[in-house]
Amino acid sequence: MGNNVVVLGTQWGDEGKGKIVDLLTERAKYVVRYQGGHNAGHTLVINGEKTVLHLIPSGILRENVTSIIGNGVVLSPAALMKEMKELEDRGIPVRERLLLSEACPLILDYHVALDNACEKARGAKAIGTTGRGIGPAYEDKVARRGLRVGDLFDKETFAEKLKEVMEYHNFQLVNYYKAEAVDYQKVLDDTMAVADILTSMVVDVSDLLDQARQRGDFVMFEGAQGTLLDIDHGTYPYVTSSNTTAGGVATGSGLGPRYVDYVLGILKAYSTRVGAGPFPTELFDETGEFLCKQGNEYGATTGRRRRTGWLDTVAVRRAVQLNSLSGFCLTKLDVLDGLKEVKLCVAYRMPDGREVTTTPLAADDWKGVEPIYETMPGWSESTFGVKDRSGLPQAALNYIKRIEELTGVPIDIISTGPDRTETMILRDPFDA
C-alpha cells in the first residue's frame, strides 16, 4: 500500500495534473505543493463547474483534506489572497483547510518587475516566463537574501530586511534594466496588511508529514509544471526555476526521500509546450491545429496558445528515468478521436546521422534533432467520457499498449474527459 503518492507531469507541463490530484484526494488526508509558485495553472471540473488553481493545492475543494504549501514553493501574498478570496466567495473555508511552511520564500512586487525587465532585455532570446516573479524569487532564495513567510513574525526586522533587499534590486532595475524603481513603502504596507493571515497558517510541515507517516495517513504530493522543465534536468535554459522531478518532493516539503511510495506520471496522449525551447515533434500543419482546437490548448495561467505535436516517447523515457515512475495516468486520449493515423516518436536522428533513444540535456544540443516516428491506425469512435477499458476502440487500446511497451511503465489511470468522473482507475496508487 502506498501512503505517500507523488503526482507530477512527465512532459512540459499542462498534462492534466490538477484533475487527477483532485480525483485521488478522495482518499487523502493531506495534499502538498512542493515546488513552483502561482505560475502553475491546475484546472478542475466538478459537476460541470470549473475551478482554476494557481498556488493553492488541488485538494482545497474537499472538506476532509488539509492542503499544504511546502517550503519549495515561492509564495506571492497577493496571489494567495486573491485565490483565497475567490474560493471563499464560493463558500469554501480556505483558512480552515490550508497550511504553510514558514520557509516559503515570498514573491513581492520587485520580483515581478525584475522578471518582466529581464525578459524584455533578452529580446528574441526570451525564455517565455509567465512574468509572475518566480525566477527572481528563487534567485533571491539561492543568494540567501530572500524574505520568507517566517520573517513576517517580526515586523520590525522584516521592514529592515525589505529595505535592504529593495535598495539592491531597485539599483539593478534603474541602472541596468533602465526600468522604474519599485516603491518600498507600498510593498511594505501591502505585505504587512496580510502578514497576520499568513503567519496564522504556518506549521512545521516536515514534522506534520512525519507524524502523518507514522499514523499511516494518505498524503498526495502535487507537482507543478513538468519534468522536462526541471531546472537541472530540463531543456536548459528554457526551463522553470524549480525541481519539477520527484526529487523535489523531499527538498520541497521535508519528507524523507525513502518514504515516497508511488510516483504517478501524468502523460498527455500527445505533446504540448508553452513558450520557447526545443520541441522535436511540434506540428505546424492542420494536425497541429486540430490538436490545439480539440484539446483547448490555451494556458490556464497565461491564456497563451500552446504548441502542439505528437507524443514523444524518447522524452517521456527521460521522465521515467528521472522520476522512477511507478505508473502513468494517460490524459486527453479523446483529443485524438477522429484522426486517421496517430504517430509516436520512438527515436531521434541527430544532425550527424546517428539514431538515439535518449534526449540531449542542454537546449543547444537539441538543435537539428529530427523525430523518428512509428505510425499507427487512428480511430473514428469517440472515447470521450468512456469509463471502462472495454469501451475503448481497439486502435486506442493498441496505442495505449504501445506506449507501455516503449516506456516500460504501466498506464494505471486513463482520463477521457475534464470531469473527475470521466476517468478509469485501473490501479489505484494508494493500493499499489
From Swiss-Prot:
Which SMART domains does the UniProt record give?
A: Adenylsucc_synt
Q: In which pathway does it act?
A: Purine metabolism; AMP biosynthesis via de novo pathway; AMP from IMP: step 1/2
UniProt-listed GO biological process terms: 'de novo' AMP biosynthetic process; IMP metabolic process
Binding-site residues, IMP: D14, E15, G16, K17, N39, A40, G41, H42, T130, R144, Q225, T240, R304
Cellular compartment(s): Cytoplasm
Question: What does the record give under GO molecular function?
Answer: adenylosuccinate synthase activity; GTP binding; magnesium ion binding
Question: Which cofactors, if any, are listed as required?
Answer: Mg(2+)
**Residues where GTP binds:** 13-19, 41-43, 306, 332-334, 415-417
Kindly list the positions annotated as binding substrate.
A300, T301, T302, G303, R304, R305, R306
Query: How is the cofactor bound, as the UniProt entry phrases it?
Result: Binds 1 Mg(2+) ion per subunit.
State the SUPFAM superfamilies in the record: P-loop containing nucleoside triphosphate hydrolases (SSF52540)
Q: Which domain of life is it from?
A: Bacteria
User: One Pfam match, by short name?
Assistant: Adenylsucc_synt
Catalysed reactions listed for this entry: IMP + L-aspartate + GTP = N(6)-(1,2-dicarboxyethyl)-AMP + GDP + phosphate + 2 H(+)
Keyword terms of this UniProt record: Cytoplasm, GTP-binding, Ligase, Magnesium, Metal-binding, Nucleotide-binding, Purine biosynthesis
Cite the EC number: 6.3.4.4
Q: CDD domains attached here?
A: AdSS
Enzyme category, top tier: ligase
Against InterPro entries, the record matches this protein to: Adenylosuccin_syn_GTP-bd, Adenylosuccin_syn_Lys_AS, Adenylosuccinate_synth_dom1, Adenylosuccinate_synth_dom2, Adenylosuccinate_synth_dom3, Adenylosuccinate_synthetase, P-loop_NTPase
Which positions bind Mg(2+)? D14, G41
Q: Where is the active site?
A: D14 (proton acceptor), H42 (proton donor)
Q: What does this protein do?
A: Plays an important role in the de novo pathway of purine nucleotide biosynthesis. Catalyzes the first committed step in the biosynthesis of AMP from IMP.
State the family it belongs to: Belongs to the adenylosuccinate synthetase family.
Complex formation: Homodimer.
Q: Known PANTHER family for this protein?
A: ADENYLOSUCCINATE SYNTHETASE
Under what name is this protein listed? Answer: Adenylosuccinate synthetase
Source gene? purA
